[in-house]
Amino acid sequence: MRCRLRLEGRSYAHRLYAERALLTPAAHPDRSAWEKPGFLLWHATLRWQRMVGVALKPIGLTHVQFVLLASAWFLEDRTGPPSQRELAEHAGTDAMMTSQVLRSLETDGLVERHPDPADARIKRLTVTAEGRAAAARALDAVDALDKVFFGPAGDRDDLVGLLRTLAGRDADGVPLD
């Protein structure tokens, strides 16, 4: 379906010019989308996410469940039970979506949510023994996939450094900006 222009009362030349502007690529008409880094990164990310989904299916986790479960386990071991907000910030996920996914993980017996002793409005998360086992299996599966997927990129440490730079984070995940 073509976009209709609201050009009533305009001259024929103006209407023709406006229509051609819609049909003419504005920038880099000689470059393929497959030469643009952002477009390639988008497609590489989509491919990687599909492959992660396949790797996690036998474990019974979705990709976002895996990220939140593994992140909760990491944060809990490092600094104690995280709050839902801390988990969302660490994982880079929306707070509302994080809460919904945590509800699912809680129903499955993989995490528990408890009120913070100092502030009952804050929910603290603990990963259950079953959750730790599922996270460990999932981490093994994703690590194996990453070796295959990212192998063609060359040196792992160089790739991780580049990805950290692109993500705007240091080695501890602290924003560089």
Which residue stretches match the model-derived regions?
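N-terminal helix-turn-helix DNA-binding core of bacterial DNA-binding proteins
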Residues: L46-D94
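Charged, amphipathic alpha-helical coiled-coil/dimerization segments
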Residues: C3, R103-G161
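Short, hydrophobic-biased segments on the C-terminal half of alpha helices
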Residues: Q84, L102-R103
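N-terminal leader segment of winged-helix/HTH proteins
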Residues: M1-I59, D157-D158, D177
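Short, charged, intrinsically disordered terminal tails
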Residues: R78, G168-D177
